[in-house]
Amino acid sequence: MLSLIVACLVLPLICYKLVRSYNQSREDEQFAASKGCQPPRKWSAKWPLGLDMLVKAVRYEKRQQILQLFLEEVAASGSTFEQNLLFARGIDTVEPRNIEAILSTQFTGSGIFTQDGPQWKHSRELLRPQFMTNRFRNFEQIRHAVNNLISSVPDSGVVDLQPLFFRLTFETTLFLLFGHYLPSLKSEGITGHESQFANAFNLGQDYLAQRGRLGDLYWLLGGREFKDACKVCHDFIDNAVQKALKHSSREKKVSDEEKETYVFIDALVQETREPSVLRDQCLNILLAGRDTTACCLTWTLRLLVQHPDVLSKLRDEVRDTIGMGPDAPDPTISQVKKLSYLSLVIKEVLRLYPSVPVNSRAAVKTTTLPTGGGPDGSAPLLVRRGEAVGYCVYAMHRRKDIYGPDADCFRPERWENDALKDVGYGYLPFNGGPRICLGQEFALLEVGYTVVRLLQTFETIEEAETKVPGAPLGEEKQTLTLVVSSGEGCWVSMKKGTK
């Protein structure tokens, strides 16, 4: 009797699901036909469920060359293709027209590929004044943090700059969030365990990156190590959030300068006093501000020491424009912005090593992409509700049909005389459309100023002699989380100039 009752309850539900799925499939087919959509190419997987691609991804990740797999798959499957992995269908693309559609045109307004709608827009408006009204204070903090970095270089002159760059951007991003220098944050008990936090933050990102590649089966990865890392990160930020909440609860007199200063956490506290919301917002900003800029600095110095001709040309520009040596003046904001060759160098670094090399959006309703369907890839293609579209900026920035036969090479001169002014969405160092990075001007200033000060202070900057010789560009070990950092560090030999 019980089994009969269960059958009577379950069978109608199964029938309902099947009918609903069938009707949805018919609606999708009709929608696709009305838009002229055709099926995209399939990816190169040979095993059921794409398991061979998963095995290959694990192998490449162990070698710390996962982005090389992306390049190979684009070469094998084309600029836009369909992937089927573990029962989930998705689209991958490195086609600028498709990425533009995802980020700015038909996928905006109605909420396509955005998960947080009005909340995201409101958070963005809260952050905008930090970069619009605090330019001078932000620049002063960059100067302060760069001086700390320079003083951290050991007397031997042989140093891995990558962790120092992460420390630098950690300082400046904490300032953006909380409005204090790192020493004053320490005195308030907010910091003091930066290394522990950094290790946990990095470990958490490693797990998130691997879980993301498993799609709906992300829960297979986790465990105590991941939970402990999350707790360390949460505790670190929660301490600062509690300080801000207590600060906002006390009535006190403030100076005119303090009234004019915009502090992100203070503005956020005026909107919500929910600690978990405040923590999540701060962690988002910390990731965007610390990791992306630190990685850009790391790749910039690696590429400069690997290309002495470019480094020499950049030194000449700094010497002629600002001056070199211990008696040279610190560059101003306007001077950094006027260094045209430095701008070309940073552009080229961000082309080869974009801050966020892989990204994706999930469709909240059935829609289309403008190209990638049909045998020649010129027809529109269907993207069903819930399906993800991944786009690999790292691979797109290496397309030879966009950047020429030497697209894999580091050549800042390719940007001279606006030679690539029409590249459009083929160049996305800071995303695009409504979600373009608010902090890009600050990040470029931070990178540019740091590079100039290093060149002014150290008369020689060369590749350090290590046991393992440096790999060719693009074949080095990389660590891919939400950003791409160097798996080999940034080992250099530096010698300070004399008066």
Curated annotation (Swiss-Prot):
The keyword Heme applies. This is Cytochrome P450 ARB_01131. PROSITE patterns: CYTOCHROME_P450. Keywords: Glycoprotein, Heme, Iron, Metal-binding, Monooxygenase, Oxidoreductase, Signal. Heme binds at residue 437. The lineage of its organism: Eukaryota, Fungi, Dikarya, Ascomycota, Pezizomycotina. Glycans are attached at residue 23. The keyword DNA repair does not apply. GO terms for molecular function: heme binding; iron ion binding; monooxygenase activity; oxidoreductase activity, acting on paired donors, with incorporation or reduction of molecular oxygen. Its cofactor is heme. Together with an NADPH cytochrome P450 the enzyme system catalyzes the terminal hydroxylation as the first step in the assimilation of alkanes and fatty acids. It comes from Arthroderma benhamiae (strain ATCC MYA-4681 / CBS 112371) (Trichophyton mentagrophytes). It holds the Pfam family p450. Residues 1-21 form the signal peptide. InterPro entries: Cyt_P450, Cyt_P450_CS, Cyt_P450_E_CYP52_fungi, Cyt_P450_E_grp-I, Cyt_P450_sf. Its EC number is 1.14.14.-.
